[in-house]
Curated annotation (Swiss-Prot):
Pfam families: UPRTase. Pathway: Pyrimidine metabolism; UMP biosynthesis via salvage pathway; UMP from uracil: step 1/1. It comes from Rhizobium rhizogenes (strain K84 / ATCC BAA-868). The gene is upp. This is Uracil phosphoribosyltransferase. Its EC number is 2.4.2.9. CDD domains: PRTases_typeI. The lineage of its organism: Bacteria, Pseudomonadati, Pseudomonadota, Alphaproteobacteria, Hyphomicrobiales. Catalyzes the conversion of uracil and 5-phospho-alpha-D-ribose 1-diphosphate (PRPP) to UMP and diphosphate. Belongs to the UPRTase family.
């Protein structure tokens, strides 16, 4: 699928299977999400630009590769997006963090925005927007609309699960933003949930309903 990368690493798929199980506890779900987010982050950042820097090892000077440019921004769509942040920050602790408060109205399935906080210079940084689920796509589209309004243009979207309907909506709205996901499931049900999915990621992560 154009513009969409499915991260099918065996460890990602193994952990995702355990997360899908309805009997998986809140604590286990949260731990697995942190672990899987590290693996997903590894894949979504594999083509970052590098530059050479002169350093000194205990034995001699050398030219060695280092990340080029300003630090990354991880933009979390609240609240479930925060579950992906911990593992990603373990891997890239110097990253800046943005929070975008968007929730889906369960009657209209439309996004409702209530919070936005991001570095002032986001136009100069690569932004990785994170949300475990790309269902209808409405919340992620609204979040990226907001980032673009603030000048962001180098954006990637990372999720755990995606529905074909959400991918189609997202790609129509933001064809310039690549999507990275661990799996593309069958469809959305009448309530807008991904099927077979894993339930409501935020509720399973925080033990709420």
């Amino acid at each position: 699928m154009d513009g969409v990368t499915v991260i099918d690493h065996p460890l990602v798929q193994h952990k995702l299977t355990i997360m899908r199980k309805k009997e998986t506890s809140t604590g286990s779900f949260r731990r697995l999400l942190r672990e899987i987010s590290t693996l997903l982050c590894y894949e979504v950042t594999r083509d970052l630009e590098m530059t050479m820097e002169t350093i000194e090892t205990p034995l001699q000077p050398m030219e060695s590769p280092i990340l080029e440019g300003k630090k990354l921004v991880f933009a979390s769509i609240l609240r479930a997006g925060n579950g992906l942040l911990e593992g990603m920050l373990d891997l890239v602790p110097s990253a800046r963090v943005s929070h975008i408060g968007v929730y889906r109205d369960h009657e209209t399935l439309q996004p409702v925005e209530y919070y936005f906080k991001a570095p002032e210079d986001i136009s100069e940084r690569l932004i990785i927007v994170v949300d475990p689920m790309l269902a209808t796509g409405n919340s992620s589209i609204a979040a990226i609309d907001k980032l673009k309004e603030r000048g962001a243009h180098n954006i990637r979207f990372l999720c755990l699960l995606a529905a074909p309907e959400g991918i189609a909506n997202f790609r129509a709205a933001h064809p310039d933003v690549p999507v990275f996901t661990a799996a593309i499931d069958s469809h959305l049900n009448e309530l807008g949930y991904i099927v077979p999915g894993l339930g409501d990621a935020g509720d399973r992560m925080y033990g709420t309903k």
